[in-house]
C-alpha cells in the first residue's frame, strides 16, 4: 500500500515494477525495483491494492507480501494455472478479491482461490455471455451492500452489434447468493459521496419543500 505497482511493461508483458516507498516519483532507489514473473502465466492484466497485493496474469495469480530489506516483496504463486483473462474482470473490497476466469467466478481467500459460481452459475454465465465481446466485461464491488458485480454483454441482445453491456450478474458475498439485472451501460465503478451540510443544501434546492428525502435520514450522511 506504500508503493505504486505497475505491470505489463512495454516490451516485458510479464514484468511488475514498483516505485520507491511512499514516493511514486522515484523509480530507482528507496526500495524501488522490478521483477519478471517466470512461467507461462501470460501477461500481467491486473494488480490489486492493500496490505497484500495480488498480481493477476492471464493464467496465474501471484501474491505480493512486503518484507523489506534487499528482497522488498516476497512473491508467491497461489494459482499456477488460473488467472484473469481480462483485467477488468477483477474487483476487490479491501482484502476480499473477486474475479472471473475463463472457467468461472472465484474469490481469493488468503492463499486459496475458491470457486463461488460452481456448477449452475458458471454454466449459466458461459451460455449467456456474448463471447465475441468478452473483453467488455467490467467488475466492481459495492462494499455497503456487500456485492460483487460483473457487467457483461449477453447473447440475448440480438441487436447488439457494438458490445454494449446489457446484463449484470451480482454476487452477495454476505449471503452467498446470486442475482441478475438488466442494464444498458459500458462501465460500472464504486463511488462514494461526501456528507451534506446545511451550507451545501442549496446545491440540492433553494426550497426545502422541494426536497423529497427527509432531513433526518441517512441519505445525507455521505459515504454511499
Please provide the spans of the model-predicted regions.
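Hydrophobic alpha-helical transmembrane segments corresponding to the first two to three helices
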Residues: 35-37
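Carboxylate/His-rich catalytic cores and anion/metal-binding grooves
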Residues: 1-26, 30, 40
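Beta-sheet-dominated scaffold domains
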Residues: 3, 39-224
Amino acid at each position: 500500500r506504500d508503493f505504486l505497482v505497475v505491470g505489463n511493461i512495454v516490451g516485458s508483458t510479464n514484468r511488475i515494477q514498483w516505485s520507491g516507498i511512499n514516493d511514486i516519483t522515484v523509480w530507482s532507489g528507496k526500495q524501488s525495483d522490478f521483477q519478471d514473473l517466470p512461467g507461462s502465466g501470460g501477461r500481467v492484466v491486473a494488480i490489486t491494492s492493500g496490505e497484500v497485493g495480488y498480481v493477476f496474469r492471464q493464467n496465474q495469480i501471484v501474491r505480493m507480501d512486503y518484507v523489506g530489506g534487499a528482497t522488498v516483496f516476497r512473491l508467491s504463486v497461489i494459482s499456477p494455472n488460473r488467472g484473469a483473462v481480462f483485467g477488468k474482470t477483477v474487483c476487490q473490497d479491501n482484502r476480499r478479491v473477486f474475479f472471473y476466469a475463463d472457467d468461472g467466478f472465484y474469490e481469493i481467500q488468503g492463499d486459496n482461490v475458491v470457486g463461488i459460481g460452481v456448477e449452475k452459475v458458471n454454466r449459466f454465465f458461459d451460455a449467456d455471455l456474448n463471447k465475441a465481446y468478452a473483453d467488455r466485461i467490467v467488475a466492481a464491488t459495492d462494499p455497503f451492500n456487500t456485492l460483487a458485480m460483473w457487467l457483461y454483454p449477453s447473447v440475448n441482445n440480438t441487436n447488439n452489434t457494438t458490445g454494449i453491456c446489457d446484463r449484470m450478474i451480482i454476487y452477495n458475498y454476505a449471503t452467498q447468493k446470486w442475482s441478475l439485472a438488466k442494464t444498458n451501460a459500458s462501465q460500472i465503478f464504486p463511488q462514494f459521496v461526501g456528507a451534506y451540510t446545511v451550507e451545501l443544501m442549496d446545491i440540492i434546492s433553494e426550497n426545502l419543500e422541494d426536497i423529497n428525502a427527509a432531513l433526518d435520514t441517512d441519505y445525507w450522511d455521505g459515504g454511499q
